[in-house]
């Protein structure tokens, strides 16, 4: 138990009586502090302060307290974190690149390190002598990440903004004085993720004198080694973490590379998001990925599931410079943040509030946890400083005057209840508040539909009116025919859109109809009005038998009066018959039945005159219905009539009866047939009962009623 022995030291962990520290290890996290002597300013070549971009503790046995820091101007400094003398604090300093150094990595167990720079190269350095061992060339854009394998000291990997992942081996011979990549993954994180290889790519000819184009859609932000043959990488915009098998030579085929495994973006953001840091725990099982959606996702790198095991929240990640680190025992996660603080989470309890390392005044970018000393943490910030945080439990007993020497301290972050509810809970339906006596609801006036389409305005409604009911009750009518009390209102969570609409007042001017009350807004609205059985049937003369407007000035036109207009009744809407064309074409035939007479008889029987109605009331015997009246009843109820009833047969019977009478023969003379006065005959044609033969032989063909006979 290395860390128990560390915290049990008299300086850090023991109490006043020398008893060992038995509290949980996470209780010590609030004891991290930074004093003025542990705050170091990062200077550039000309002596001005520049921000540091990368830091890493040495992996050499006996030199794990040495911290390497690289800044924006390409200078690398080695700090001895155990030295109390400020004059000998910096062990080594050298200009590694003429451009910014974005990442730095120590060779496992050796006094060597590799720097990744914006000058498109990576360099291998001997830190003891301060000499350059070799330079790696191959990338066409800035290098963003560099990583070594724990099992191989000569092999490392780099990722750049050109979208390529390159593997280097320092045991290979140099070509033209530079190391060349032994394996390459081209387009590892394109914006469009393709699961299958595409067609062979065509290489574009390079133009001399022009810098290569930078495609921000395929930048590789971080690469790490999982084992000797496996590399894990992440991109800037695709939101996918990919695992690659280096035993496959990806540079042989000019196709889109296919990873052996990938972790898709687990969040719900629609923006193009990426990852700024990847880190494995000491066992190599848990993979921590810092995403730009302000979350750190923990994946199981050795399992089959691609969903995150845990999610760590509370910090802010708005740039690709924010890095993460894991404690030596793998129990805690350290990360930088854009809100000027560093955060520490407990891996076993991701929902617990993290610990804040407060003191920086700008974004905290790179962080490092000493792998041989749990009590030491290093942070880099855009305020141009590097700070060393130490675990000091003696500060609990110190006075307030001694705390003025501190430039940084740790405290537990307090989550706001509203923010925690938004993170952990899904927004649900609003519930009723029992403590309030009034609840906002629409006013009666605004429940009625309006032309503007505005939403209902709030008003105060007692909660007693919002009690749930078993079903809606129909409003009762009072004695004078008006509307009674409005039905009980439904709960606000059960009201549908149709319950907000009320029926508009009818256009009828009857005295018995009244405008519905606006409080009837919560009753169901019917699409068509229901006609009461007690409704008084008005005579047909008073009903709307409207004529169509025409440009003809002949008011005696029989077509307009009898055959082309239908009464506006629901049962007659679909029984319209255009008799005008038949009348104009067939009335020229001397054997043809005049449709004007037929229409006249139809109107007379459909709308009897007042004198006829009085005569019928005076007599006891009802009049005998003619076959024409039977045809009229069939015509009126055409939609509901049976198929056996045929109006053409009635016309045939009428034609036979008129043909047998001498009155019809005299009217069918050539002189009367050629005159135009037959088209406008008087409308008082005789209406007498006709005996209808029932034998099929007496019936004529239908063509004789519509075509003229040849003379």
Curated annotation (Swiss-Prot):
Residues 504-516, 606-627, 684-697 have a biased composition (Polar residues). GO terms for molecular function: protein-macromolecule adaptor activity. WD repeats lie at residues 47-89, 96-135, 138-178, 215-254, 270-309, 314-355, 359-398. It is found in: Nucleus; Cytoplasm, Cytoskeleton, Microtubule organizing center, Centrosome; Chromosome. Residues 473-524, 601-698 are annotated as: Disordered. Keywords: Biological rhythms, Chromosome, Cytoplasm, Cytoskeleton, DNA damage, DNA replication, Nucleus, Repeat, Ubl conjugation pathway, WD repeat. One of its GO terms (cellular component) is cytoplasm. A motif (DDB1-binding motif) lies at residues 168-171, 244-247. GO terms for biological process: DNA damage response; DNA replication; mitotic G2 DNA damage checkpoint signaling; proteasome-mediated ubiquitin-dependent protein catabolic process; protein monoubiquitination; protein polyubiquitination; regulation of cell cycle; response to UV. Residues 631-642 have a biased composition (Basic and acidic residues). Pathway: Protein modification; protein ubiquitination. A motif (Nuclear localization signal) lies at residues 197-204. Residues 658-675 have a biased composition (Low complexity). PANTHER family: DENTICLELESS PROTEIN HOMOLOG (PTHR22852:SF0), LETHAL 2 DENTICLELESS PROTEIN RETINOIC ACID-REGULATED NUCLEAR MATRIX-ASSOCIATED PROTEIN (PTHR22852). Component of the DCX(DTL) E3 ubiquitin ligase complex, at least composed of cul4 (cul4a or cul4b), ddb1, dtl/cdt2 and rbx1. Belongs to the WD repeat cdt2 family. Substrate-specific adapter of a DCX (DDB1-CUL4-X-box) E3 ubiquitin-protein ligase complex required for cell cycle control, DNA damage response and translesion DNA synthesis. The DCX(DTL) complex, also named CRL4(CDT2) complex, mediates the polyubiquitination and subsequent degradation of CDT1, CDKN1A/p21(CIP1), KMT5A and SDE2. CDT1 degradation in response to DNA damage is necessary to ensure proper cell cycle regulation of DNA replication. CDKN1A/p21(CIP1) degradation during S phase or following UV irradiation is essential to control replication licensing. This is Denticleless protein homolog B.
